[in-house]
Amino acid sequence: KTVVNMTHHMFVNLKGLTDPCPTIEDHILTVNANWFLPTDNTMIPTGAINPVDSTPFDFRKPKKIGEALACEDDPNIILGHGVDHNFVLNQKRQGEIIFAGKCVDPETKRYMEIYTTEPGMQIYTSNWHDGFKGYHGVRMPRRSAVAFETQHFPDSPNIGHFPSVVLSPGEIYT
């Protein structure tokens, strides 16, 4: 048996590349999730599955990313220095292609939609970027990009009630 949890870690800033890269705090985010995974102080999910209601993680209706980041008294925002959490997507059947989310830059009107067959989506707001040089030498300061990582839940092999990531001999990963 093999543990498989494929994802990607693409960063986006819908404003485009300028030096230094602007923040994504005014990007408007919608996420198709009623639940998220809180983490411990090492940013590993605790095993709890919490409702997004009345938390900074409630993106069920379009909301600026910066509104969540401004909730500096929320323990989950404090631990991650921003958003670095997995959202439990509203999926009716495992493997079904669903709308996971949408991100819009209100200034340029650029947007992206995310669709997936995975049960979760990790969202990371580049909380640890420190001005390193990225694509074309553009400086990437904190909050200069956002990543949308569709995947199974982090630490699934160690948390029995999370969806399985075990692939048995003869099974095909889809």
Name each model feature, range by range.
Residues 1-174:
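An exposed, glycine/acidic-rich loop-and-rim segment of catalytic or binding clefts
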